[in-house]
Amino acid sequence: YHLIDAEMVSLDLHDRLEIAPGDSLTVVGPHGTETVGPDEDNLVRRALALAGRTASVTLHKQIPAGAGLGGGSADAAAVLRWAGFTDLRAAAALGADIAFCLVGGRARVTGIGEIVDPLPHDRRTFTIVTPPIFCSTPAVYRAWDEMGGPAGDNGNDLEPAALVVAPELVRWRDELADQTDRRPQLAGSGSTWFVEGAFPDVGRVVTTVPAYEWKRRGD
């Protein structure tokens, strides 16, 4: 495990889970099985095992996997909440942001993710860009360790390591910076970049990037 000190916030971007009696997992939607990974590795499966429950789950995947947005963690937290599971330390052992996803809102998260200190609500608008690049969180942390644990200069210490794992991220960062005249920040271990504000308006295209093949980095 790594010790973290992060500010986390809930977004109005979400997956949807249908839970019924049974023992199966089906992933559908625009960010389905081709990016989520093997069934046995899915955080929904692992959350069910942690809670000692079985269920038939249909996961409607809207949050890109490997984007640093905590989609898999939010799914796991939804299952744990359904099961009535409230042990934040055990939840954090599955993933560093799962305990936060159980609590939600806005918080400072420390330890291995099990210490969740709520912060005041702060309504803000962000523009996010999710490149078609899957950034493996374990791979980014490995790169960070191999680099000697460098500190980032823009609010996220994992950014230098993510750029080693997926150098293509630079192109997307620079394009967003050019279009917004702001320096983008990396979400989590990547691959999402974000800036504060709406450019030019909520729900509209910020910029068009030439066709780019979806890639998985750091398996």
Regions found by a protein language model. Name each.
Residues 2-7, 85-185, 196-219:
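ATP-dependent small-molecule kinase catalytic core of the GHMP/sugar-kinase superfamily
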Residues 64-66, 99, 191-194:
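Short, active-site-adjacent cap segments at secondary-structure transitions
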Residues 5, 45, 77-80, 141:
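Predominant activation on well-ordered alpha-helical scaffold segments within soluble catalytic domains
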Residues 27, 44-47, 80, 166, ...:
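Short, hydrophobic beta-strand segments that form beta-sheet elements in well-ordered domains
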Residues 67-92:
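DPxDG-like acidic metal-binding loop motif
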Residues 71-72, 186-191:
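Glycine-rich beta-strand-to-loop/alpha-helix junction loops that act as flexible
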